[in-house]
Each structure stands twice: as structure tokens, then as C-alpha cells.
Regions:
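Residues that scaffold the ATP/ADP-binding catalytic core of kinase and kinase-like folds
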Residues: 13-14, 46, 81, 128
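Active-site-proximal, substrate-binding regions of enzyme catalytic domains
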Residues: 42-83, 87-88
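Short active-site oxyanion
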Residues: 1, 29-33, 66-69, 113-117
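Histidine- and aromatic-rich ligand-binding microenvironments
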Residues: 5-6, 35-36, 100-101, 122, ...
Length: 134
């Protein structure tokens, strides 16, 4: 199975939570694992806001690169991500969730291009056929 790991899943993995243990097992058993480059930026921002030492941030980013193929934003991904974002935004309005971020669109768009399942606990992805819920 091909998977794409989103920010939510990485945060849980680095916390060492029960969900994080599940993420680790999913990554280890996957045929291929991906994460968009935007997820590295998103996690880096989160950790710097939380005043996590830079050395630890870099270690986590390196671990992500070691565990997954990092997918760049490409001319092929941009339209896929934009369409995915619009779908997520419409569903969020319907379900009365906060608006998704463009990062969410990049995650879903990249997963669709790779024909991969998104590993997440983010409510924006709940119920989608592309989701492995943690």
C-alpha cells in the first residue's frame, strides 16, 4: 500500500502518543511512503512557534526525509491541490468545520496523484476514501 503522511500524523508520531505508534506501524508496513514538502515547512513553523530547539526541529525533519519520499510542489500538483482544497472547503462548510488550509489541499492533491492513502487524524479528511484514520 502507498501512503502519504500528513502533519497531524507526524505530530502524533513525534509526541510518542498511541496514535503516533499507529503511524509508525503504518509507515513501516507501507510499500511506499510520501509526505509533501509543505508538511516539512508546516511542522517547522509549529515547532519554532513552540520554541522547540532548532537542533531537535532539524532532527525531526531529517527523520521525516528518511522515512518518506518528500514530494515537491510541481505544475502537476498545483492544480490537483487547488481542486482538492475547494472540495475540502465545501465539505468543511457543510460540516461546519473551520476552513481547511492550502496545506490540506496539497496533502490531498499529492495523495491523489500518487494514488496513496492519507494517514491523518485531521477532521477535514475524515470519511474520505483516501484516508487512513488514526
Amino acid at each position: 500500500m502507498k501512503i502519504l503522511v500528513d502533519s497531524y500524523a507526524w505530530v502524533e508520531l513525534f509526541l510518542g502518543s498511541g496514535k503516533g505508534g499507529r503511524v509508525r506501524g503504518i509507515i513501516e508496513s507501507a510499500d511506499e511512503a510520501f509526505t509533501p514538502d509543505s508538511v516539512l515547512a508546516e511542522l517547522s513553523r509549529k515547532y519554532f512557534r513552540e520554541r522547540v530547539p532548532e537542533r531537535l526541529v532539524k532532527e525531526r525533519l531529517s527523520a521525516m526525509q528518511g522515512a518518506c519520499h518528500v514530494l515537491p510542489i510541481t505544475p502537476e500538483l498545483a492544480p490537483s491541490a487547488s481542486k482538492a482544497y475547494l472540495e475540502l472547503a465545501e465539505e468543511a462548510r457543510r460540516r461546519r468545520l473551520r476552513s481547511p488550509s492550502l496545506f490540506d489541499g496539497l496533502v490531498l492533491g499529492a495523495a491523489r496523484l500518487q494514488e496513496a492513502k492519507v494517514v491523518t487524524g485531521d477532521p477535514h479528511f475524515q470519511g474520505l476514501p483516501e484516508t487512513i484514520w488514526i
